[in-house]
């Protein structure tokens, strides 16, 4: 398969003759085992990481290199209950490697404020925190994954064409095929476009507009429900309960 991929799909642009040190992939060991990347795909990921490292020499790229795969260190694959897909990382030093999350000292971004408003309106006893750190969700089995893992300062979507698409799609399809009874929360077109990767017979897929202020107020024409009022957080826990899985405490937001 590696030889076919190299010759047919990637036209021999990458060499798989040289082994890859798994530590250079920045992924947590459990994720390396779970994804079972072939030698060719490891080399392809390493090439992408090297490209990002070179870009950092001449421009500011978010998140920092040590946070690029932070999602894999916060949430073990066997613990996943819910997958929340973001787009590309925050700017202005806010990106932490977890979709929608920011460090406690950072101001809560507009999209996350919309998420907190939906939680406060739908989840009993939820109280909006003073910070935007979602690490505690990740520790409960909520995978907070951006579809594009890096972005150039001041240029939203600037790294969409670099090659992250194949890698994050591989992650999603691996979760779908290897795990059971997970909930996928897909908000906005870029996340919803990944729906074909998910086996809806094994998992619950919930879609809505993106929780950005404009979209969440219905300011954009869309075929998908508005984010405000989608009730996804309760629906996710209802599904987990039906399948005898531990629910997510959405209100547990420790700094």
From Swiss-Prot:
Q: What is its EC number?
A: 3.2.2.27
Keyword vocabulary terms for this entry: DNA damage, DNA repair, Host nucleus, Hydrolase
Q: Which PROSITE patterns match?
A: U_DNA_GLYCOSYLASE
Top class in the EC scheme: hydrolase
Where is this protein found? Host nucleus
Has keyword DNA damage? Answer: yes
The UniProt catalytic activity note for this protein reads: Hydrolyzes single-stranded DNA or mismatched double-stranded DNA and polynucleotides, releasing free uracil
What is one Gene Ontology biological process annotated in the Swiss-Prot or TrEMBL record?
A: base-excision repair, AP site formation via deaminated base removal
**Which catalytic residues are annotated?**
88
Q: Which domain of life is it from?
A: Viruses
Q: Give the Gene Ontology MF terms in alphabetical order.
A: uracil DNA N-glycosylase activity
Q: Which InterPro entries match?
A: UDG_fam1 (IPR002043), Ura-DNA_Glyclase_AS (IPR018085), Uracil-DNA_glycosylase-like (IPR005122), Uracil-DNA_glycosylase-like_sf (IPR036895)
Q: Which GO terms describe its cellular component?
A: host cell nucleus
Q: Which HAMAP family match?
A: UDG
The family annotation for this protein states: Belongs to the uracil-DNA glycosylase (UDG) superfamily. UNG family.
What is the role of this chain?
Answer: Excises uracil residues from the DNA which can arise as a result of misincorporation of dUMP residues by DNA polymerase or deamination of cytosines. Therefore may reduce deleterious uracil incorporation into the viral genome, particularly in terminally differentiated cells which lack DNA repair enzymes.
What is this protein called in UniProt? Answer: Uracil-DNA glycosylase
Give the organism, scientific name: Human herpesvirus 8 type P (isolate GK18)
